Amino acid sequence: MISVNDFRTGLTIEVDGGIWRVVDFQHVKPGKGAAFVRSKLRNLRTGAIQEKTFRAGEKVAKAQIETKTMQYLYANGDQHVFMDTSSYEQLELSATQIEEELKYLLENMSVHIMMYQDETLGIELPNTVELKVVETEPGIKGDTASGGTKPAKTETGLVVNVPFFVNEGDTLVVNTSDGSYVSRA
């Protein structure tokens, strides 16, 4: 059991029969009345986000999530195949299970598969990934004075707003938490 006062972003808990990851939290101490913790939780089974308020000091069960390092091999229709790098076992996940992560996945990429009591909950991506630009408008000389951006389509289909100096064929470093441009690789 863990106190809600010890909430941290990324913590995994069991509440109301579900497995939830803390996305955001805020300790609130009103002038009148008892303190409480307002939290935003993501259901790891369904991907749904829910806001929940806990009384300060309330205890919740911490979910024991096991992670395995696996390599993304290929897409087989609606199924995506991953291989355990130590035992060479293969695991298939449906596109609906990893819908948000698909736009960052490249073949042979290492990811962490989240498991809870032999149930696969989803995948955990690295903080940044390198993606190649396949389509973007050419930058026009002198456009950089405004510091603007333009859309660029990557090899996975993700559209990222990039500075004008980025061209087709460039490799970008992209933040996986919000899909934003970090730098050129």
Curated annotation (Swiss-Prot):
It comes from Bacillus subtilis (strain 168). Involved in peptide bond synthesis. Stimulates efficient translation and peptide-bond synthesis on native or reconstituted 70S ribosomes in vitro. Probably functions indirectly by altering the affinity of the ribosome for aminoacyl-tRNA, thus increasing their reactivity as acceptors for peptidyl transferase. Pfam families: EFP, EFP_N, Elong-fact-P_C. Belongs to the elongation factor P family. It comes from the Bacteria. GO terms for molecular function: translation elongation factor activity. The keyword Cytoplasm applies. Pathway: Protein biosynthesis; polypeptide chain elongation. One of its GO terms (biological process) is peptide biosynthetic process. Disruption phenotype: No sporulation at 37 or 47 degrees Celsius. The gene is efp. Keywords: Cytoplasm, Elongation factor, Protein biosynthesis. CDD domains: S1_EF-P_repeat_1 (cd04470), S1_EF-P_repeat_2 (cd05794). InterPro entries: Elong-fact-P_C, NA-bd_OB-fold, Rib_uL2_dom2, Transl_elong_fac_P/YeiP, Transl_elong_KOW-like, Transl_elong_P/YeiP_cen, Transl_elong_P/YeiP_CS, Transl_elongation_fac_P. It is found in: Cytoplasm. SMART domains: EFP (SM01185), Elong-fact-P_C (SM00841). PROSITE patterns: EFP (PS01275). GO terms for cellular component: cytoplasm. This is Elongation factor P.
